[in-house]
Amino acid sequence: MSDIDKESLKQNQKQWENEVELGESREANQDDELLMSLGYKPEFTREFSYVSIFGQSFGSMGLCPAMAGSLIFSMNCGGGGMVWSWIIGCICLIPVSISLGELASSMPTSGGLYFWIFTLASPSSRAFLCWVCGYVSVLGYATIYASTVYSASSMVQALAVIGSPSYSPTKYEQYGIYAALLFVISAMTAIPSRVIAKVNIINITFQFLVSIILIIALAAGSDSTTRNSGSFIFGDFTNYSGWSNMGWAFILSFTTPVWVVSGFESSAAVAEESTNAAKAAPFAMISSLGVATILGWCIVITVVATMGHDFNAILGSSLGQPVAQVLVNNVGNKGALGIFSLLVIALCLNCISLLIAASREVFAFCRDGGIPGSRYLRLLTKQKVPLNAILLVLLYSLLVGLLILVNVTAISSVFNLAIIALYIAYSGPLMCRFVYNKFQPGVFYVGKWSKPAALWSLVWMWFMILMLLFPQYQKPNQDEMNWAIVVLGFVMVFCVVYYYLPKIGGKTFFTGPIPTVQQENEYISGVPLNELSLSSLPLPKDFDQKQITE
């Protein structure tokens, strides 16, 4: 190749790089202008691409490890119950992802749910509704994170038992593991957005690999003693629940799918860190749920196909984890130790994604003064990390984790609490959309199917809320009660009392989302006038600056 050709190639490459950079700059400017039109000054750097924001949603599910930690809830009515509750539960959530995706496209802010409800509600009620929704959504995100870390701590203990069968774990040791994981994950999450975006891509790859490894290992390692027939996989409905009614036992099995895939909406929490957020956020919600539905069903079918007929032995296993026992039965202790270790790592990556979403939700609500101490909690580090918000979620998780010291039933109710709080928060803006009819569609909108999808979402979520408030046993004693209603009730009472408290209550200072931008006419293409220069504007390639200077 001649020197002229090389020089021409370099020039073309440089021109292409400049055009890509200019395109990204224009896209970022459009995102920032949309955010400023909603009243907020851009404070995060936009490092999340379509792939990394998909990773945020899909990674928040932690599909395979989350299923491994929660399949015990879907074993209420046999193999068929496990298989069909998963696919039905996930399909019923698709309209929810569409409805929330429309809201995220219309109003792509980290405030998400409580900002949406403020925009869609009436002027007379929107401040109070926004206040309640803010508290409930923060509770939901923080609790789904805490429940996932608890699941990880249970899996760590199962690993210890697999490696040393004589080991007998205690609840105090589990709380110690739980607390240690909280501190480690908090430290791993206090990193800049550009690093988190790369971690999300790693998370996607690792989650898929672990899922494939689990499916192949169980299928290859099973034999005639553990392998089940198709009629058992799809048609066995034996009642193993604490309820006598088979129909209700099947409904209780929905706890697993609604808990596992609950992270699909977390892309809205990082909308202010995403490029082309109005399209990317709904894309991540819907596509991640679709992938999880199919891949998760394959995992459930494989587990049921290789777990044998003796459910009682698996449920009563000393490992405390059904999937761990299924692995031991099929691939032996050493194989189970290796594969289950991968599941624990995958679940920790899942926890990172969940803490990212929870901390952004806390930051956004504190930016609007919703939580006591917001002046400090909303601060960002020099690297644009909401460290104080992360620490608040850490403190809450340490406190709610004390339920470990009560009993397994008490801490298991945290799984229910997470979904209940999130579903209440999800349903708020959808209800306001029907009542006040103020919704303005964004670039993602399904037209005539929009309202039916929103209506179905409300029906399904409130049905699930009622189901999750029930205890695991038909006639529970004090130790078997569902603690979800206790924690939820405490938070609801606190936020309502704090709002109406004379002189210092939220009603005296909280008016909803607080605009943080300068006046609209002080911005051009997302740049403040006092910082404006030709180099800061997305000018065409053939623009000649001499035309102005001359």
Curated annotation (Swiss-Prot):
Topology class, membrane: Multi-pass membrane protein
GO molecular function, one term: amino acid transmembrane transporter activity
Keywords (A to Z) from UniProt: Amino-acid transport, Membrane, Transmembrane, Transmembrane helix, Transport
Annotated segments matching region Disordered: 1-24
Claim: rRNA processing is one of the keywords in the record: no
Localization annotation: Membrane
GO process terms (BP): amino acid transmembrane transport; gamma-aminobutyric acid transport
InterPro entries: AA/rel_permease1 (IPR002293), Amino_acid_permease_CS (IPR004840)
Membrane spanning stretches: 53-73, 78-98, 127-147, 177-197, 201-221, 246-266, 283-303, 336-356, 386-406, 411-431, 453-473, 481-501
GO cellular component, one term: membrane
Main location (coarse class): membrane
Domain of life: Eukaryota
Family: Belongs to the amino acid-polyamine-organocation (APC) superfamily.
PANTHER family cross-referenced by the UniProt entry: AMINO-ACID PERMEASE BAT1 (PTHR45649), GABA-SPECIFIC PERMEASE (PTHR45649:SF6)
Name assigned to this protein: Uncharacterized amino-acid permease C11D3.08c
Protein source organism: Schizosaccharomyces pombe (strain 972 / ATCC 24843) (Fission yeast)
